[in-house]
Regions:
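A short linear-motif detector with a strong N-terminal bias
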Residues: 13-14, 46, 70-73
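Beta-strand-rich binding-surface signature
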Residues: 6-8, 24, 30-34, 65-70, ...
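Structured beta-strand/turn binding interfaces of compact recognition modules in eukaryotic regulators
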Residues: 14, 38, 96
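C-terminal edge-of-domain segments
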Residues: 64-99
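Histone-fold modules and their flanking histone-like tails across chromatin and transcription assemblies
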Residues: 1-27
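Charged, well-structured alpha/beta interaction segments
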Residues: 28-49, 53-56
Length: 99
């Protein structure tokens, strides 16, 4: 895995808690992790960020306060299987650890 991708969690079709766990593991070693998603996975990315921010606060999580940072939205041009170019919505959510 390249260094630039270690601070990024890409949201797909796995169970929600798999992404929450992955993000928390990365936050134990890094000050900031970016959650990225596109298309139908955007809602799941928001859910992951909210679970991390709210549940760790209530549980007294040991790596410090976790806050949601910058949120970026946009779109990408992707070519579909039928050869047409389509706009797909994207989101990037920064989750930060305060020491």
């Amino acid at each position: 895995m390249s260094t630039e991708n270690r601070d990024t969690v890409y949201i797909g079709k796995k169970p929600l808690m798999a992404y929450v766990t992955s993000t928390l593991i990365q936050l134990a070693n890094l000050p900031k992790v970016t959650i990225k998603a596109r298309g139908l996975s955007i809602g799941r990315a928001v859910d992951v960020a909210q679970i991390i921010a709210r549940k760790t606060e209530n549980a007294g999580y040991s790596i410090g306060d976790i806050k949601i940072g910058d949120i970026k939205i946009g779109s990408e041009l992707l070519e579909s299987q039928d050869g047409k170019t389509r706009n797909v919505s994207t989101i990037e959510i920064a989750v930060k650890r305060n020491n």
